[in-house]
Amino acid sequence: YRELRRWGFSDPSAVTVFGYGGAMLPETFSENDIDDLNQLPVIRTDSKILFYAQGPISWSYNEKTKEYDHEQNTYSTAGYYFLTDSKNQSATIVEREGGQTTGLQDITSFDEHAVYEQELYSPGSTGRLFLGDDFRYTTSKSFTFELPGVDNSSPVKLRTSFGAKILGGTATLVFTRNGQTLPSSNTDNIGAGSSSSYDFVRMTSTLKEIDLDSEELAFTLLFRQNGGSLSMARLNYFRFNYKRKLQLYNGSIQFRLGQLPANSCYNLQGYSTTTHIWDISDPLNPVSVKPNVNNGNARFVPTKGNEEYIAFDEQATVASVEFIEKVPNQNLHGLTTPDMVILTPKEYISYAQSIARLHNENDGMEVAVIDHETVFNEFSSGTPDATAYRRLMKMFFDRKGGLDGEPLYLLLFGKGLYDNRKIGETGKYVKYPTLLTYQHGSGTDERQSYTTDDYFGFLDDDSGNRIASDKLRVNIGRLPIKSEQEAKDVVSKLYNYIENNDKGSWKNQVLVVADDENYAIHMEQAEEICSIMENSDCLLYTSPSPRDTERSRM
Protein backbone atom coordinates (compact mmCIF):
# COMPACT_ATOMS: atom_id res chain seq x y z
CA TYR A 1 0.00 0.00 0.00
CA ARG A 2 2.94 2.34 0.63
CA GLU A 3 3.83 2.14 -3.05
CA LEU A 4 0.24 2.77 -4.15
CA ARG A 5 0.08 5.88 -1.96
CA ARG A 6 3.32 7.11 -3.50
CA TRP A 7 1.67 6.77 -6.92
CA GLY A 8 -1.20 9.00 -5.82
CA PHE A 9 -3.86 6.60 -4.50
CA SER A 10 -5.13 8.00 -1.20
CA ASP A 11 -7.13 4.83 -0.42
CA PRO A 12 -5.20 1.77 -1.68
CA SER A 13 -7.96 -0.54 -0.49
CA ALA A 14 -10.21 0.93 -3.21
CA VAL A 15 -7.76 0.26 -6.06
CA THR A 16 -8.94 -2.09 -8.82
CA VAL A 17 -6.91 -3.64 -11.64
CA PHE A 18 -7.68 -3.80 -15.38
CA GLY A 19 -5.88 -5.38 -18.33
CA TYR A 20 -4.43 -8.62 -19.65
CA GLY A 21 -0.69 -8.15 -19.67
CA GLY A 22 2.14 -8.92 -22.04
CA ALA A 23 1.11 -11.89 -24.18
CA MET A 24 0.92 -11.12 -27.90
CA LEU A 25 -2.60 -10.66 -29.24
CA PRO A 26 -3.92 -13.49 -31.46
CA GLU A 27 -3.44 -12.49 -35.09
CA THR A 28 -6.57 -14.28 -36.30
CA PHE A 29 -9.84 -12.53 -35.48
CA SER A 30 -12.31 -14.71 -33.61
CA GLU A 31 -15.46 -14.30 -31.58
CA ASN A 32 -13.40 -14.80 -28.41
CA ASP A 33 -11.26 -11.70 -28.94
CA ILE A 34 -11.09 -9.34 -25.98
CA ASP A 35 -12.63 -5.93 -26.58
CA ASP A 36 -11.56 -3.06 -24.35
CA LEU A 37 -10.21 -3.67 -20.83
CA ASN A 38 -11.38 -6.33 -18.41
CA GLN A 39 -11.29 -6.07 -14.64
CA LEU A 40 -9.22 -8.65 -12.78
CA PRO A 41 -10.10 -10.26 -9.46
CA VAL A 42 -7.65 -9.44 -6.67
CA ILE A 43 -6.84 -10.56 -3.15
CA ARG A 44 -6.60 -7.78 -0.57
CA THR A 45 -4.48 -8.05 2.57
CA ASP A 46 -3.65 -5.46 5.21
CA SER A 47 -0.66 -4.25 3.19
CA LYS A 48 -1.11 -5.10 -0.50
CA ILE A 49 -3.30 -6.25 -3.33
CA LEU A 50 -2.43 -9.41 -5.26
CA PHE A 51 -3.43 -10.34 -8.81
CA TYR A 52 -2.16 -12.68 -11.52
CA ALA A 53 -0.14 -10.88 -14.20
CA GLN A 54 1.18 -12.17 -17.53
CA GLY A 55 4.60 -11.21 -18.85
CA PRO A 56 5.81 -11.00 -22.48
CA ILE A 57 6.73 -14.71 -22.82
CA SER A 58 3.94 -17.18 -23.64
CA TRP A 59 4.20 -20.96 -23.29
CA SER A 60 2.27 -23.74 -25.04
CA TYR A 61 2.45 -27.52 -24.97
CA ASN A 62 3.79 -29.22 -28.09
CA GLU A 63 2.00 -32.54 -28.54
CA LYS A 64 4.59 -33.73 -31.06
CA THR A 65 7.75 -33.15 -29.02
CA LYS A 66 6.06 -33.48 -25.59
CA GLU A 67 7.78 -30.24 -24.60
CA TYR A 68 6.60 -26.74 -23.74
CA ASP A 69 7.49 -24.16 -26.41
CA HIS A 70 7.85 -20.46 -25.72
CA GLU A 71 7.05 -17.35 -27.75
CA GLN A 72 8.52 -13.91 -27.12
CA ASN A 73 6.25 -10.92 -27.62
CA THR A 74 7.74 -9.35 -30.74
CA TYR A 75 6.36 -5.91 -29.85
CA SER A 76 7.05 -5.49 -26.14
CA THR A 77 9.48 -6.49 -23.40
CA ALA A 78 6.90 -6.11 -20.60
CA GLY A 79 3.23 -6.57 -19.77
CA TYR A 80 1.10 -3.62 -18.68
CA TYR A 81 -1.93 -3.18 -16.41
CA PHE A 82 -4.10 -0.25 -15.36
CA LEU A 83 -4.92 0.73 -11.78
CA THR A 84 -7.80 2.98 -10.76
CA ASP A 85 -9.67 4.00 -7.61
CA SER A 86 -12.75 5.28 -9.45
CA LYS A 87 -15.28 3.48 -7.23
CA ASN A 88 -15.41 0.29 -9.29
CA GLN A 89 -16.93 -2.71 -7.58
CA SER A 90 -14.24 -5.34 -7.05
CA ALA A 91 -14.32 -8.34 -9.38
CA THR A 92 -15.01 -11.57 -7.53
CA ILE A 93 -13.11 -14.77 -8.12
CA VAL A 94 -15.04 -17.97 -8.77
CA GLU A 95 -14.33 -20.86 -6.40
CA ARG A 96 -14.46 -24.61 -6.92
CA GLU A 97 -13.96 -27.57 -4.64
CA GLY A 98 -10.84 -29.70 -4.93
CA GLY A 99 -12.86 -32.84 -5.58
CA GLN A 100 -12.74 -36.33 -4.11
CA THR A 101 -9.06 -37.32 -3.78
CA THR A 102 -9.35 -40.49 -1.71
CA GLY A 103 -7.68 -43.44 -3.43
CA LEU A 104 -6.14 -41.36 -6.22
CA GLN A 105 -2.48 -41.39 -7.23
CA ASP A 106 -0.59 -38.35 -5.93
CA ILE A 107 1.16 -36.09 -8.43
CA THR A 108 4.17 -34.67 -6.54
CA SER A 109 6.13 -33.23 -9.46
CA PHE A 110 5.13 -31.25 -12.53
CA ASP A 111 6.37 -30.16 -15.96
CA GLU A 112 8.56 -27.10 -15.41
CA HIS A 113 9.95 -24.98 -18.21
CA ALA A 114 12.48 -22.17 -18.45
CA VAL A 115 14.41 -20.38 -21.16
CA TYR A 116 17.73 -18.62 -21.56
CA GLU A 117 17.52 -16.21 -24.49
CA GLN A 118 19.38 -13.01 -25.30
CA GLU A 119 17.83 -11.12 -28.21
CA LEU A 120 20.66 -8.98 -29.54
CA TYR A 121 20.95 -9.27 -33.32
CA SER A 122 18.61 -9.61 -36.31
CA PRO A 123 20.29 -11.73 -39.03
CA GLY A 124 18.53 -10.02 -41.95
CA SER A 125 17.17 -6.81 -40.42
CA THR A 126 13.73 -8.24 -41.05
CA GLY A 127 11.31 -10.63 -39.41
CA ARG A 128 10.93 -11.59 -35.77
CA LEU A 129 14.12 -13.54 -35.13
CA PHE A 130 16.77 -12.06 -32.85
CA LEU A 131 19.84 -14.09 -31.94
CA GLY A 132 22.06 -13.88 -28.88
CA ASP A 133 25.55 -15.01 -27.80
CA ASP A 134 28.17 -14.63 -30.55
CA PHE A 135 30.35 -17.72 -31.18
CA ARG A 136 32.44 -16.41 -34.09
CA TYR A 137 35.51 -15.47 -32.07
CA THR A 138 34.97 -17.39 -28.83
CA THR A 139 33.83 -20.72 -30.23
CA SER A 140 33.50 -22.50 -26.88
CA LYS A 141 31.43 -21.18 -23.98
CA SER A 142 30.46 -22.67 -20.63
CA PHE A 143 27.04 -22.24 -19.05
CA THR A 144 25.69 -22.95 -15.57
CA PHE A 145 22.00 -22.88 -14.66
CA GLU A 146 20.35 -23.42 -11.29
CA LEU A 147 17.19 -25.55 -11.35
CA PRO A 148 15.75 -25.37 -7.80
CA GLY A 149 13.58 -28.33 -6.91
CA VAL A 150 14.46 -30.37 -9.99
CA ASP A 151 13.24 -33.95 -9.74
CA ASN A 152 16.35 -35.95 -10.62
CA SER A 153 14.36 -39.12 -11.28
CA SER A 154 13.78 -37.78 -14.81
CA PRO A 155 16.30 -36.23 -17.22
CA VAL A 156 16.36 -32.55 -18.09
CA LYS A 157 15.46 -31.87 -21.72
CA LEU A 158 17.80 -29.21 -23.09
CA ARG A 159 16.54 -27.76 -26.38
CA THR A 160 19.17 -25.65 -28.17
CA SER A 161 18.36 -23.34 -31.08
CA PHE A 162 21.41 -22.03 -32.94
CA GLY A 163 22.01 -20.11 -36.16
CA ALA A 164 25.01 -19.75 -38.47
CA LYS A 165 25.89 -18.54 -41.94
CA ILE A 166 28.82 -20.27 -43.62
CA LEU A 167 29.64 -19.84 -47.30
CA GLY A 168 30.89 -23.12 -48.72
CA GLY A 169 31.04 -24.96 -45.41
CA THR A 170 29.15 -26.52 -42.53
CA ALA A 171 29.34 -26.53 -38.73
CA THR A 172 28.68 -28.84 -35.80
CA LEU A 173 27.52 -28.16 -32.25
CA VAL A 174 29.40 -30.18 -29.62
CA PHE A 175 28.11 -30.43 -26.03
CA THR A 176 30.35 -31.53 -23.16
CA ARG A 177 29.55 -32.06 -19.49
CA ASN A 178 31.96 -33.05 -16.73
CA GLY A 179 34.62 -33.56 -19.37
CA GLN A 180 32.47 -36.00 -21.36
CA THR A 181 31.04 -35.32 -24.80
CA LEU A 182 27.28 -35.79 -24.92
CA PRO A 183 25.87 -38.14 -27.59
CA SER A 184 25.61 -36.44 -30.97
CA SER A 185 22.72 -36.33 -33.44
CA ASN A 186 22.11 -35.14 -36.99
CA THR A 187 20.42 -32.01 -35.64
CA ASP A 188 23.77 -30.91 -34.16
CA ASN A 189 24.87 -30.08 -37.71
CA ILE A 190 24.32 -26.82 -39.58
CA GLY A 191 24.74 -27.22 -43.33
CA ALA A 192 24.26 -25.28 -46.54
CA GLY A 193 20.97 -25.78 -48.34
CA SER A 194 19.83 -25.50 -51.96
CA SER A 195 18.67 -21.92 -51.34
CA SER A 196 21.71 -20.80 -49.36
CA SER A 197 22.14 -17.63 -51.46
CA TYR A 198 18.85 -16.39 -50.03
CA ASP A 199 19.61 -17.37 -46.45
CA PHE A 200 20.26 -14.72 -43.85
CA VAL A 201 21.04 -17.57 -41.46
CA ARG A 202 20.53 -21.32 -41.26
CA MET A 203 19.02 -22.56 -38.02
CA THR A 204 19.10 -25.86 -36.20
CA SER A 205 17.19 -27.11 -33.18
CA THR A 206 18.74 -29.98 -31.26
CA LEU A 207 17.73 -31.85 -28.11
CA LYS A 208 19.88 -33.32 -25.35
CA GLU A 209 18.56 -35.28 -22.37
CA ILE A 210 20.77 -34.83 -19.32
CA ASP A 211 20.65 -36.71 -16.02
CA LEU A 212 21.41 -34.60 -12.95
CA ASP A 213 22.48 -35.51 -9.42
CA SER A 214 22.07 -31.97 -8.06
CA GLU A 215 20.11 -28.79 -8.78
CA GLU A 216 22.85 -27.41 -11.02
CA LEU A 217 23.09 -27.91 -14.77
CA ALA A 218 26.53 -27.06 -16.17
CA PHE A 219 27.80 -27.77 -19.67
CA THR A 220 30.00 -26.39 -22.44
CA LEU A 221 28.89 -25.66 -25.99
CA LEU A 222 31.50 -25.73 -28.77
CA PHE A 223 30.78 -24.33 -32.24
CA ARG A 224 33.01 -26.28 -34.65
CA GLN A 225 33.34 -24.87 -38.16
CA ASN A 226 33.93 -27.38 -40.95
CA GLY A 227 35.47 -25.32 -43.75
CA GLY A 228 34.06 -22.38 -45.66
CA SER A 229 33.82 -18.69 -44.80
CA LEU A 230 31.96 -17.88 -41.58
CA SER A 231 29.99 -14.64 -41.23
CA MET A 232 27.58 -15.50 -38.40
CA ALA A 233 27.38 -17.95 -35.50
CA ARG A 234 24.95 -17.15 -32.69
CA LEU A 235 22.96 -18.94 -30.03
CA ASN A 236 19.23 -18.38 -30.25
CA TYR A 237 18.19 -19.95 -26.95
CA PHE A 238 18.49 -22.78 -24.46
CA ARG A 239 15.07 -24.05 -23.41
CA PHE A 240 14.66 -26.39 -20.46
CA ASN A 241 11.84 -28.87 -19.84
CA TYR A 242 12.14 -30.91 -16.66
CA LYS A 243 10.25 -32.40 -13.74
CA ARG A 244 10.13 -30.21 -10.63
CA LYS A 245 8.94 -31.04 -7.14
CA LEU A 246 5.48 -29.65 -6.42
CA GLN A 247 5.99 -27.24 -3.54
CA LEU A 248 6.20 -23.50 -2.92
CA TYR A 249 9.46 -21.77 -3.81
CA ASN A 250 9.91 -18.38 -2.15
CA GLY A 251 6.19 -18.31 -1.54
CA SER A 252 4.81 -19.26 -4.96
CA ILE A 253 4.85 -21.79 -7.77
CA GLN A 254 3.21 -21.97 -11.20
CA PHE A 255 2.62 -25.52 -12.40
CA ARG A 256 1.00 -27.78 -14.98
CA LEU A 257 1.23 -31.23 -16.61
CA GLY A 258 1.27 -31.84 -20.34
CA GLN A 259 -0.02 -35.38 -19.86
CA LEU A 260 -2.06 -36.20 -16.76
CA PRO A 261 -1.96 -39.79 -15.42
CA ALA A 262 -5.32 -41.51 -15.01
CA ASN A 263 -6.93 -41.53 -11.56
CA SER A 264 -4.57 -38.95 -10.14
CA CYS A 265 -4.60 -35.71 -8.19
CA TYR A 266 -2.12 -32.95 -7.42
CA ASN A 267 -0.42 -33.01 -4.01
CA LEU A 268 1.10 -29.62 -3.20
CA GLN A 269 3.50 -29.59 -0.26
CA GLY A 270 3.98 -26.62 2.07
CA TYR A 271 0.37 -25.44 2.05
CA SER A 272 -0.81 -23.15 4.88
CA THR A 273 -3.87 -21.11 5.83
CA THR A 274 -2.48 -18.14 3.84
CA THR A 275 -1.85 -20.17 0.68
CA HIS A 276 -4.08 -19.81 -2.37
CA ILE A 277 -4.35 -22.08 -5.42
CA TRP A 278 -5.70 -20.56 -8.62
CA ASP A 279 -6.54 -22.21 -11.92
CA ILE A 280 -5.18 -19.64 -14.39
CA SER A 281 -5.87 -21.55 -17.61
CA ASP A 282 -7.99 -18.52 -18.47
CA PRO A 283 -5.79 -15.81 -16.93
CA LEU A 284 -8.55 -13.21 -17.19
CA ASN A 285 -10.94 -15.34 -15.16
CA PRO A 286 -8.93 -17.30 -12.58
CA VAL A 287 -10.72 -19.90 -10.49
CA SER A 288 -9.83 -20.42 -6.84
CA VAL A 289 -9.40 -24.08 -5.91
CA LYS A 290 -10.28 -25.26 -2.38
CA PRO A 291 -8.05 -28.32 -1.84
CA ASN A 292 -8.31 -31.10 0.67
CA VAL A 293 -5.60 -30.26 3.23
CA ASN A 294 -3.82 -32.61 5.62
CA ASN A 295 -0.56 -31.85 7.46
CA GLY A 296 0.47 -29.14 5.00
CA ASN A 297 -0.31 -31.22 1.92
CA ALA A 298 -3.00 -29.84 -0.39
CA ARG A 299 -4.64 -32.39 -2.68
CA PHE A 300 -7.06 -31.57 -5.50
CA VAL A 301 -8.28 -33.07 -8.76
CA PRO A 302 -7.70 -31.30 -12.11
CA THR A 303 -10.89 -30.74 -14.06
CA LYS A 304 -9.51 -31.44 -17.55
CA GLY A 305 -5.88 -32.38 -17.15
CA ASN A 306 -4.08 -29.61 -19.02
CA GLU A 307 -4.85 -26.66 -16.77
CA GLU A 308 -2.31 -24.08 -15.65
CA TYR A 309 -2.19 -23.39 -11.91
CA ILE A 310 -0.47 -21.00 -9.58
CA ALA A 311 -0.10 -21.42 -5.82
CA PHE A 312 1.03 -18.52 -3.67
CA ASP A 313 1.27 -17.41 -0.07
CA GLU A 314 -0.39 -14.03 0.42
CA GLN A 315 2.16 -13.16 3.12
CA ALA A 316 5.22 -13.87 0.96
CA THR A 317 7.21 -11.27 -0.91
CA VAL A 318 5.88 -10.98 -4.45
CA ALA A 319 7.26 -9.56 -7.68
CA SER A 320 7.29 -5.77 -7.68
CA VAL A 321 5.72 -3.66 -10.39
CA GLU A 322 6.94 -0.44 -11.99
CA PHE A 323 4.94 2.76 -12.29
CA ILE A 324 4.92 3.94 -15.91
CA GLU A 325 2.66 6.98 -16.19
CA LYS A 326 -0.70 8.48 -15.35
CA VAL A 327 -3.20 7.83 -18.14
CA PRO A 328 -5.82 10.50 -18.93
CA ASN A 329 -9.37 9.43 -19.69
CA GLN A 330 -9.97 8.40 -23.29
CA ASN A 331 -12.69 6.65 -25.28
CA LEU A 332 -11.78 5.48 -28.76
CA HIS A 333 -14.73 3.10 -28.62
CA GLY A 334 -16.99 6.15 -28.33
CA LEU A 335 -15.65 7.93 -31.44
CA THR A 336 -17.97 8.66 -34.32
CA THR A 337 -16.99 6.28 -37.11
CA PRO A 338 -14.63 8.21 -39.42
CA ASP A 339 -13.88 7.89 -43.12
CA MET A 340 -10.14 8.06 -42.47
CA VAL A 341 -7.95 7.20 -39.50
CA ILE A 342 -4.51 8.75 -39.06
CA LEU A 343 -2.33 6.92 -36.55
CA THR A 344 0.73 8.80 -35.37
CA PRO A 345 3.08 9.23 -32.42
CA LYS A 346 1.97 12.08 -30.16
CA GLU A 347 4.98 14.14 -31.29
CA TYR A 348 3.43 14.52 -34.77
CA ILE A 349 -0.21 15.05 -33.78
CA SER A 350 -0.38 18.69 -34.95
CA TYR A 351 0.97 17.80 -38.40
CA ALA A 352 -1.45 14.88 -38.71
CA GLN A 353 -4.28 17.25 -37.83
CA SER A 354 -3.22 19.48 -40.73
CA ILE A 355 -3.58 16.50 -43.07
CA ALA A 356 -6.98 15.77 -41.54
CA ARG A 357 -8.15 19.31 -42.26
CA LEU A 358 -6.90 19.01 -45.83
CA HIS A 359 -9.01 15.91 -46.49
CA ASN A 360 -11.99 17.32 -44.64
CA GLU A 361 -12.01 20.56 -46.62
CA ASN A 362 -11.22 19.06 -50.03
CA ASP A 363 -12.77 15.59 -49.87
CA GLY A 364 -15.48 16.03 -47.26
CA MET A 365 -13.94 13.26 -45.16
CA GLU A 366 -14.43 12.79 -41.45
CA VAL A 367 -10.90 12.12 -40.21
CA ALA A 368 -9.87 10.82 -36.78
CA VAL A 369 -6.31 11.65 -35.72
CA ILE A 370 -5.25 9.18 -33.04
CA ASP A 371 -2.13 8.90 -30.91
CA HIS A 372 -1.19 5.26 -31.46
CA GLU A 373 -0.38 4.72 -27.78
CA THR A 374 -4.04 5.34 -26.94
CA VAL A 375 -4.89 2.45 -29.26
CA PHE A 376 -2.78 0.14 -27.11
CA ASN A 377 -4.60 1.37 -24.00
CA GLU A 378 -7.98 0.17 -25.28
CA PHE A 379 -7.09 -2.69 -27.61
CA SER A 380 -4.00 -4.40 -26.12
CA SER A 381 -3.99 -3.62 -22.39
CA GLY A 382 -1.45 -0.83 -22.82
CA THR A 383 1.09 -3.28 -24.25
CA PRO A 384 2.43 -2.27 -27.70
CA ASP A 385 1.03 -4.66 -30.32
CA ALA A 386 0.53 -4.15 -34.06
CA THR A 387 -2.69 -6.17 -33.92
CA ALA A 388 -4.16 -3.40 -31.74
CA TYR A 389 -4.04 -1.10 -34.80
CA ARG A 390 -5.95 -3.78 -36.69
CA ARG A 391 -8.53 -4.23 -33.96
CA LEU A 392 -9.23 -0.49 -34.03
CA MET A 393 -9.79 -0.62 -37.79
CA LYS A 394 -11.91 -3.76 -37.42
CA MET A 395 -14.20 -1.87 -35.05
CA PHE A 396 -14.69 0.97 -37.54
CA PHE A 397 -15.01 -1.41 -40.50
CA ASP A 398 -17.81 -3.36 -38.83
CA ARG A 399 -19.59 -0.16 -37.79
CA LYS A 400 -19.51 1.02 -41.40
CA GLY A 401 -21.29 -2.14 -42.45
CA GLY A 402 -18.32 -4.21 -43.55
CA LEU A 403 -18.12 -4.81 -47.29
CA ASP A 404 -21.46 -3.10 -47.80
CA GLY A 405 -20.31 0.09 -46.10
CA GLU A 406 -18.44 3.16 -47.27
CA PRO A 407 -14.67 2.99 -47.99
CA LEU A 408 -12.33 3.32 -45.04
CA TYR A 409 -8.83 4.79 -45.15
CA LEU A 410 -5.83 4.38 -42.85
CA LEU A 411 -2.77 6.62 -42.87
CA LEU A 412 0.23 5.62 -40.76
CA PHE A 413 2.01 8.90 -40.10
CA GLY A 414 5.42 7.81 -38.83
CA LYS A 415 8.37 5.60 -39.66
CA GLY A 416 8.55 1.99 -38.56
CA LEU A 417 11.38 -0.39 -37.71
CA TYR A 418 11.82 -4.10 -38.16
CA ASP A 419 13.00 -4.00 -34.53
CA ASN A 420 9.72 -2.97 -32.90
CA ARG A 421 11.10 -3.30 -29.37
CA LYS A 422 14.34 -1.41 -30.19
CA ILE A 423 16.39 -4.13 -28.54
CA GLY A 424 18.92 -4.99 -31.27
CA GLU A 425 22.31 -3.58 -32.13
CA THR A 426 20.71 -0.99 -34.42
CA GLY A 427 17.26 -0.41 -32.96
CA LYS A 428 18.44 0.48 -29.45
CA TYR A 429 20.10 3.61 -30.82
CA VAL A 430 16.97 4.88 -32.59
CA LYS A 431 15.74 7.94 -30.71
CA TYR A 432 12.94 9.21 -32.94
CA PRO A 433 9.31 8.14 -32.29
CA THR A 434 8.08 5.24 -34.40
CA LEU A 435 4.93 3.36 -35.31
CA LEU A 436 4.86 -0.43 -35.14
CA THR A 437 5.38 -2.61 -38.19
CA TYR A 438 4.06 -6.07 -38.95
CA GLN A 439 6.94 -8.46 -39.64
CA HIS A 440 6.02 -11.60 -41.55
CA GLY A 441 8.24 -14.64 -41.26
CA SER A 442 11.01 -15.61 -38.90
CA GLY A 443 13.72 -13.61 -40.68
CA THR A 444 15.92 -16.50 -41.86
CA ASP A 445 15.22 -16.32 -45.62
CA GLU A 446 14.94 -13.08 -47.59
CA ARG A 447 12.16 -14.54 -49.77
CA GLN A 448 9.96 -15.43 -46.82
CA SER A 449 10.39 -12.44 -44.51
CA TYR A 450 9.05 -8.97 -45.18
CA THR A 451 7.23 -5.99 -43.73
CA THR A 452 3.70 -5.24 -44.89
CA ASP A 453 1.18 -2.65 -43.75
CA ASP A 454 -1.48 -4.66 -45.58
CA TYR A 455 -1.84 -6.64 -42.35
CA PHE A 456 -3.73 -3.73 -40.79
CA GLY A 457 -6.36 -4.00 -43.52
CA PHE A 458 -7.24 -7.69 -43.13
CA LEU A 459 -10.54 -7.12 -41.34
CA ASP A 460 -12.76 -10.07 -42.22
CA ASP A 461 -13.71 -12.44 -39.42
CA ASP A 462 -11.11 -15.23 -39.06
CA SER A 463 -8.58 -13.25 -41.12
CA GLY A 464 -5.04 -12.37 -40.16
CA ASN A 465 -2.80 -15.39 -40.58
CA ARG A 466 -3.10 -15.97 -44.34
CA ILE A 467 -1.12 -13.11 -45.81
CA ALA A 468 -1.29 -14.48 -49.36
CA SER A 469 -5.06 -14.93 -49.45
CA ASP A 470 -6.62 -12.57 -46.88
CA LYS A 471 -8.50 -9.68 -48.47
CA LEU A 472 -7.50 -6.07 -47.98
CA ARG A 473 -10.55 -4.13 -46.75
CA VAL A 474 -8.94 -0.75 -46.03
CA ASN A 475 -7.04 1.71 -48.21
CA ILE A 476 -3.67 1.99 -46.44
CA GLY A 477 -0.70 4.29 -46.79
CA ARG A 478 2.31 5.23 -44.69
CA LEU A 479 4.34 8.42 -44.59
CA PRO A 480 7.61 7.24 -42.96
CA ILE A 481 8.59 10.47 -41.26
CA LYS A 482 11.12 10.46 -38.44
CA SER A 483 11.37 14.12 -37.42
CA GLU A 484 9.21 17.20 -37.02
CA GLN A 485 10.95 18.80 -40.01
CA GLU A 486 10.07 15.82 -42.21
CA ALA A 487 6.48 15.99 -40.94
CA LYS A 488 6.32 19.68 -41.79
CA ASP A 489 7.79 19.09 -45.27
CA VAL A 490 5.36 16.24 -46.02
CA VAL A 491 2.35 18.31 -44.98
CA SER A 492 3.54 21.16 -47.19
CA LYS A 493 3.92 18.81 -50.17
CA LEU A 494 0.44 17.39 -49.66
CA TYR A 495 -1.11 20.85 -49.57
CA ASN A 496 0.83 21.88 -52.67
CA TYR A 497 -0.31 18.76 -54.49
CA ILE A 498 -3.99 19.23 -53.63
CA GLU A 499 -4.10 22.98 -54.17
CA ASN A 500 -1.99 23.13 -57.33
CA ASN A 501 -4.40 23.18 -60.28
CA ASP A 502 -1.69 22.59 -62.89
CA LYS A 503 -2.61 19.22 -64.43
CA GLY A 504 0.78 18.74 -66.05
CA SER A 505 2.88 15.61 -66.37
CA TRP A 506 3.77 15.69 -62.68
CA LYS A 507 0.19 14.68 -61.91
CA ASN A 508 -0.53 12.52 -64.93
CA GLN A 509 2.51 10.26 -65.31
CA VAL A 510 3.41 7.34 -63.09
CA LEU A 511 6.74 5.56 -62.66
CA VAL A 512 6.48 2.01 -61.29
CA VAL A 513 9.62 0.63 -59.65
CA ALA A 514 10.15 -3.11 -59.14
CA ASP A 515 12.86 -5.47 -57.91
CA ASP A 516 14.42 -7.91 -60.38
CA GLU A 517 14.91 -10.78 -57.89
CA ASN A 518 13.06 -14.14 -57.85
CA TYR A 519 13.42 -14.64 -61.59
CA ALA A 520 11.94 -11.20 -62.32
CA ILE A 521 8.51 -12.11 -60.95
CA HIS A 522 8.19 -8.68 -59.33
CA MET A 523 8.84 -6.95 -62.65
CA GLU A 524 6.11 -9.06 -64.22
CA GLN A 525 3.75 -8.07 -61.42
CA ALA A 526 4.64 -4.41 -61.96
CA GLU A 527 3.83 -4.75 -65.65
CA GLU A 528 0.43 -6.19 -64.76
CA ILE A 529 -0.23 -3.12 -62.63
CA CYS A 530 0.86 -0.86 -65.46
CA SER A 531 -1.47 -2.62 -67.86
CA ILE A 532 -4.50 -1.39 -65.94
CA MET A 533 -3.28 2.19 -65.80
CA GLU A 534 -3.86 4.79 -68.43
CA ASN A 535 -0.87 6.21 -70.33
CA SER A 536 1.42 3.34 -69.36
CA ASP A 537 2.82 2.68 -72.81
CA CYS A 538 6.42 3.35 -71.82
CA LEU A 539 8.22 1.12 -69.31
CA LEU A 540 11.70 2.20 -68.23
CA TYR A 541 14.06 -0.51 -66.94
CA THR A 542 17.08 0.72 -65.04
CA SER A 543 19.48 -0.62 -62.43
CA PRO A 544 20.65 1.75 -59.69
CA SER A 545 23.94 -0.14 -59.24
CA PRO A 546 26.21 -2.60 -61.10
CA ARG A 547 24.55 -5.97 -61.53
CA ASP A 548 25.63 -8.88 -59.36
CA THR A 549 25.59 -12.01 -61.51
CA GLU A 550 25.01 -14.31 -58.55
CA ARG A 551 22.01 -12.42 -57.23
CA SER A 552 20.44 -11.27 -60.52
CA ARG A 553 18.24 -14.09 -61.74
CA MET A 554 16.78 -12.94 -65.04
Segments predicted by a language model, with ranges:
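Cysteine-dependent hydrolase recognition
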Residues: Y1-S543, R547
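Positively charged, low-complexity/disordered segments
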Residues: P546-D548, S552-M554
